[in-house]
Swiss-Prot record:
UniProt xrefs under InterPro entries: Membr_insert_YidC, Membr_insert_YidC_N, YidC/ALB3/OXA1/COX18, YidC/Oxa/ALB_C, YidC_ALB_C, YidC_periplasmic_sf
Full protein name: Membrane protein insertase YidC
GO CC terms: plasma membrane
Organism placement in taxonomy: Bacteria, Pseudomonadati, Pseudomonadota, Gammaproteobacteria, Enterobacterales
Organism: Pectobacterium carotovorum subsp. carotovorum (strain PC1)
Region (Disordered): 112-132
Principal location class: membrane
Gene: yidC
């Protein structure tokens, strides 16, 4: 097998990849815009009238740290808005990324409360609790490392509920602590819950789609339990509601680069559930083990809420396996170590683009023995072509005998007919793993390289890199010996660089740059290997 046929194999692998991506997109089709209907009784007011609560609504208070800007509704104490201050909405924008949102077009909230027989959030006990606060806005001051937002509600029976949000500097994980002071004469049966609720259909301004070719990123729910470290649960899966009991884990809503998650921290078994609401919304949540607060006693209940980017090391520190929410697809076992290596290199280099170039040299250096074996195998196969042709003429149409004698010839000449394919079969998963890494790692979102490349996770706006990639592919093809004599195959090979250039027009610029550098290294390695093969009589220069 010669290098031209290797290019055909690469093309076949690419087509297979594209078909698989198309199947994934069909399985989880992007949602279309749809008007959000009236919220259910568990939903708080519309945030379009912020600061002017409608009848039955609570007051909207604002909370700001160095990394988060939140809006909390005092009716129930739900987080209705969340902006990520360190992440622009789009490249070059002054607006921070809008993660949680409550508008007439789209609802995405982090809810929590106390249900159970005596819970103030139990619909059977009336409207959700209306908390009071000492002020309408809270902000983390300079030199302050922790911000506490206490909210108090006193029920008709005299029981006092204090819901406190605790935020820390530089942290996307916030604690939600409930303190129940039962001053009544009766015990209270309570169940802590946390829920993430989101509109199933995306309005245009929330569309996370990309112009990258065949790109599909997951948007939906996920959870981790005692039995499953990480499991996606798409909106379509919620036609059959989740209902499991676990002693550990978390529930989450995911999208490209960002996530929200509830992590129960109260001891005991938790119930994880999903629910498709009748208003075009879906929810995933947890219910903690029920507790009984004796008359005249006090009880604390708590959970942790993650609202932010999918930063793997920080998420892993918050909860086991929470870092698995970074969507590296089915090649996660390659993408994860690749990203760790890339991050290590970035610590020294300081530029993600040059780090990708460095990792390309490392990968190709490690692959060099296989590459050398590939070219040696192809050279031996070329030398066997006259013997194989003579064998075909001698044996004729007896396929079984031809196959037997071919294998005997390969064995006697110590040639592996698949030796030229094996290195490619290893390189393609690495290439695809890098693709997923670029699409799933928030660190590479809007990461600049140099000159006109301002975002390595987006396509080259001027298509310069794909054209350069096609040029390098053309040179590799011209420098490679060929045994292809079929006119149709020759025509296909002639247009292969053009076809690949078109493929790469919409690929992330970081991935195209990886392929360009990989091709340049291939050219250098090719010349080095050919010189060695010439000395062994396995290769001769030929004019193309």
């Amino acid at each position: 097998m010669d290098s031209q046929r290797n290019l055909l194999l690469i093309a076949l692998l690419f087509v297979t990849f594209m078909l698989w991506q198309a199947w994934e997109t069909d399985k989880n089709p992007p949602a279309t815009t749809q008007a959000i209907q009236q919220a259910t009784n568990a939903v708080t007011g519309d945030a379009t009238n912020q600061g002017v609560p409608a009848s039955g609504q609570g007051k909207l208070i604002t909370v700001k740290t160095d990394v988060l800007s939140l809006t909390i509704n005092t009716r129930g104490g739900d987080v209705e808005q969340a902006h990520l201050l360190a992440y622009p909405d789009t490249l070059g924008s002054d607006k921070p990324f809008h993660l949680l949102e409550t508008t007439s077009e789209f609802v995405y909230q982090a809810q929590s409360g106390l249900t159970g027989k005596n819970g103030p959030d139990n619909p059977a006990n009336g409207p959700r609790p209306l908390f009071t606060t000492t002020q309408d806005s809270f902000e983390l001051a300079d030199g302050q490392n922790e911000l506490r937002i206490p909210m108090t509600y006193t029920a008709a029976d005299g029981v006092t509920y204090t819901k406190t949000f605790v935020l820390k500097r530089g942290d996307y994980a916030l604690n939600v602590d409930y303190s129940v002071n039962n001053t009544s004469a009766q015990p209270l049966e309570l169940t802590l819950f946390g829920q993430l609720k989101q509109s199933i259909d995306l309005p245009k301004h929330r569309d996370t789609g990309s112009s990258n070719f065949a790109l599909h990123t997951y948007r939906g729910a996920a959870f981790s339990s005692s039995e499953d470290k990480y499991k996606k649960y798409s909106f379509s899966d919620m036609d059959e509601n989740l209902n499991i009991t676990t002693n550990s884990g978390w529930v989450a809503m995911l999208q490209q680069y960002f996530a929200t998650a509830w992590i129960p921290t109260t001891a005991g078994a938790n119930t994880f559930y999903t629910n498709k609401l009748g208003n075009g919304q879906a929810a995933i949540g947890f219910k903690a083990a029920p507790v009984v607060v004796a008359a005249g006693s006090q009880q604390n209940l708590n959970a942790t809420l993650w609202v932010g980017p999918e930063i793997q090391d920080k998420m892993a520190a918050v909860a086991p396996h929470l870092d698995l929410t970074v969507d590296y697809g089915w090649l996660w076992f390659i993408s994860q170590p690749l990203f760790k290596l890339l991050k290590f290199l970035h610590g020294f280099i300081g530029n993600w683009g040059f780090s990708i170039i460095a990792i390309t040299f490392i990968v190709r250096g490690v692959m060099y023995p296989l590459t050398k074996a590939q070219y040696t195998s192809m050279a031996k196969m070329r030398l066997l072509q006259p013997k194989l042709q003579a064998m075909r003429e001698r044996i004729g149409d007896d396929k079984q005998r031809m196959s037997q004698e071919m294998m005997a010839l390969y064995k006697s000449e110590k040639v592996n007919p698949l030796g030229g394919c094996f290195p490619l079969l290893i390189q393609m998963p690495i290439f695809l793993a890098l693709y997923y890494m670029l699409m799933g790692s928030v660190e590479l979102r809007h990461a600049p390289f140099a000159l006109w490349i301002h975002d390595l996770s987006a396509q080259d706006p001027y298509y310069i890199l794909p054209i350069l990639m096609g040029v390098t592919m053309f040179f590799i093809q011209k420098m490679s010996p060929t045994t292809v004599t079929d006119p149709m195959q020759q025509k296909i090979m002639t247009y292969m660089p053009v076809i690949f250039t078109v493929f790469f027009l919409w690929f992330p610029s970081g991935l195209v740059m990886y392929y360009i550098v990989s091709n340049l290294v291939t050219i250098l390695q090719q010349q080095l290997i050919y010189r060695g093969l010439e000395k062994r009589g396995l290769h001769s220069r030929e004019k193309k």
